[in-house]
Design a protein with these regions (language model features):
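C-terminal structural segment of proteins
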Residues: 1-150
Length: 150
């Protein structure tokens, strides 16, 4: 989380480079989902991106762990820690996920620019967080061989 220091700035000294990253194998009953909203297919710059990873407790719909990351709504990718804490240890109901999505929108630090206004980006964060947490939870409940993309 501390590797990104700002736009175009990384935690590297002069002459250093990142040779690779290690991503640990997720626990059982973990699912993830990611989406990015762009104004058109030909444009590579996202208006908003939202990723979610959910680990469910065995044989229940209770979230053991939740990670939500927001892109293009702050100078660097941003963890929505308040939204995560609303869900962690809770049954993942539609209402609880909606509450967390509102919190994620409040945590975002969007700007207004030519692609979208601050208000529009915040609303996109809310809607896409709700969708991605739901999709990640669905994936966590589904055996890997039967999963579909979000």
């Amino acid at each position: 989380e501390d590797f990104m220091k700002g736009p175009g700035k990384r935690d590297l000294k002069r002459g250093e480079f990142a040779a690779g990253i290690t991503i640990p194998t997720p626990p059982a009953r973990t699912g993830s989902a990611y989406v990015r909203h762009t104004p058109r297919v030909a444009m590579d710059i996202a208006v908003v991106g939202v990723g979610a990873a959910v680990t469910l407790a065995p044989k229940s719909n209770v979230a053991k762990d939740v990670k939500i990351c927001l892109g293009a709504v702050a100078p660097i990718p941003l963890r929505a820690v308040e939204a995560e804490s609303i869900l962690r240890g809770s049954e993942l109901t539609d209402q609880r996920i909606a509450e967390a999505a509102i919190a994620a929108a409040a945590e975002a630090k969007p700007i207004s620019d030519i692609r979208a206004s601050e208000d529009f980006r915040r609303e996109l964060v809310r809607v896409l967080t709700q969708r991605m947490v739901s999709a990640a939870a669905d994936n966590a409940r589904t055996p890997i061989a039967k999963r579909r993309a979000a």
